[in-house]
Amino acid sequence: MSVQFIRGTAVADLEAPLIQATKQWLEEDAQHEVFYLVPNHIKFEQEIQVLQKLRQLQTTTSDSITSTRLQVFSFYRLAWYYLQHTPFYSADVLSDAGAAMIFRKILVEAEEELQIFRGEINKPGFIQQLFQLYQEMREGNIEIAELYPFLEKQMENPKGQDLQLKFQDLTLIFTRFQLQMSQYGYESAEIIQHLSEYLQTVDLSNVQFVISGYQQFTARELKLIEVLMAQAGSVKVALLLDKQYPHDLPDPRSLFYEAGQTYHQLYQLARQKQIPILSDYVEKKEVLITNPDLQGLNDYWIQSQEHLPPLSTTDWSGDGLFLWRAENVKEELTHVATEIRRLVVEEGYRYKEIQVLTRDLDCYENLLEPIFAEHEIPVYVDRDMAMDRHPLVEWIESLFAIHSYNYRYRDVLRFLRTELFMPMNQLATSEESLTDWLNQRNAWRRKVDITENVVLAYGYEGYYWSQEKDWEFIRYDFEAEEQEDVATMEEESNAIRQSLQRLLPSYFQAMISAKTGLEAATVFYHFLLQSGVATQLKMWRLQAIEAGQLETARNHEQTWDALMSLLDEYVTVYGESSFDFTTFQEIFVSGLEGLHYSKVPTAIDQVQVRAMDLTRPGAAKVTFAIGMTEEIFPQKIENKTLLSDEERQTINDTLTENQYLRGTTGRKIAQEPFVAYLVFSSARERLYLTYPSVKDTAQEVKPSPYFKNIQKDLNLPVFEKNETTIFDDETTSLA
């Protein structure tokens, strides 16, 4: 067993020595295996890259056999690999929405026992904050009971008393949460801890673990790595780091503080366990960033952030680093798209070799895809789409609003416009029925259109929808001086009204009359079937598959599955409890709104669009970092947790080395220059830094101070990009 650190700055290709070590380990013995551990968000890309580089090193046909003994995993995938046939992995894991249900129930039942958090259940976001703190403490390897001696001492000062009272409430809530999870038969999502315990019983002497792409770890992940170092034949850890920190922690102001702290933690763990520590391998030969301008930018940023003497003036070639100022967001994206097309058509780049980074995807997303489509640029937005945009969520919200506001016409129309309420649809979900279903759907849509016109004209609300009597109305054509023929209008609008009247009043009455959560959940499920929701979603999925829209098809399937899982967890938590309709509505609206679709990574030729925080050195040949404004780069960070920065620091000061809460706001702000470093080093050949002069309603938007410093210190031109730009050499200065 041994551990070795692979170090280097962003210019160096740290993967090269890791791939070489992997090849060497696999060739030494036919029984040897390698697990390459990387963050989940880059696992797919990293797996392709590792296998490609390994094949390039292999010289004979037999060498290809070694790749079958190589796995590229995240920590959680590694847990699945080892624990899939154990009770740890077969147990049901509670979803975030299910956890929120349990916390909600505890807060209601324990309201009179709480002191600080009494009544907070109605505060927006409180339950989410509570669950996040619970997860943070579990990941930080902290048991509240371990804090008792410290908290007792805090009674000596007023602030300490508040902290103690807060943790008394948290102790009560978290203890009951764990107890109820056990009672309901749920396994908490602490799979990393179970993996650590399990691997201590496994012979890993033939296994090499390669850990890459991380700068820091949770306390539980550190414990797992400690087990790997003690049990495995070899452990290699790659860190983006300029120097070693075996005995002392780095200066908190250091650009590489997080990685330096991780180095120090792992070094000390290995030393305490008497695990052999090999000499660091510092990569200096293999270069990841090939453009001299970008190499110079890398050196400049390190020098400026480490407060070292400035570098001598660099001769910039002008073909690697570009600074743009656009007239507005639309023009910014238009010029980015134009340049991408030029790079592909004129310079031979592939779309998949280009990435777009932003920290404000909400601002750019609606414009980005249509503008790129206009320029015929295939694009993949690496972002989990929120489920709250799906019509099923709108259907549930409007259904509950109809009950709450007694058939207010705008709620009824929202409900109908989802096109999920289609009770007459009893078609089978086979391919042969798709045409028939489309005809039926179009006929129903036409009736809804007519109904909407009638409702807007006559203002039908309340009992007009719930009564059995059909609508009757007269329309008079004053020009022709005669009554209009409204028979068809009456017939088709009443068909819609009758469908609602036949199902909704009885459904609402059944829900109100339900005695238990199980009874109410059963009523709700049958209503989903009777109103045609399940069939509609199946047909939407089939329609999307026919059109080749596989992601859309998956989204419909995931939405229905998420609703069914939520319903199952509701029955588990509230099934035997007295039914409360208001709580039911809150749970099912917030439960789906907080979920996201899982996306399947793409390997086809597309431009990748992702968050700046998720990039890595050399991720693409070309990077466009857009929206580089002062409001988001550096990011304005606020503490939105249940613990203040002072409380966090106070608690962290009392914990052992293998325990810690996440950093304070100040610590997170101090990480911003490193995020910028990752962005600036994300391109191997070309980097474009851009920002809009006008954004939303804000005039005279200012560039990021990082953008300004680079322009001023390196004396670079800023290219103006607007609708009237003719020549690329139109420049300006920020000075």
Task: Map each language-model feature to its residues.
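Extended, charge-rich low-complexity interaction segments
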Residues: D96-I116, Y263-K284, N406-E431
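Conserved P-loop NTPase-based nucleic-acid remodeling module centered on helicase motor cores
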Residues: A30-I142
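Short beta-alpha junction loops
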Residues: N40-K43, Y76, L240-H247, E283-V287, ...
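Anion-coordinating catalytic cores for phosphoryl-, nucleotidyl-, and glycosidic chemistry
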Residues: S2-T68, A91, N298-A735
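Structural recognition of the conserved hydrophobic beta-strand(s) that form the central parallel beta-sheet
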Residues: Y36-V38, V72, V210, S234-L239, ...
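Conserved RecA-like helicase ATPase core segment
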Residues: L222-F322
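Accessory N-terminal region flanking or inserted into the helicase ATPase core
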Residues: S2-F5, E109-V210, P250-D251, P292-D315, ...
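ASCE RecA-like P-loop NTPase motor cores
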Residues: M1-H32, A97, R176-A238
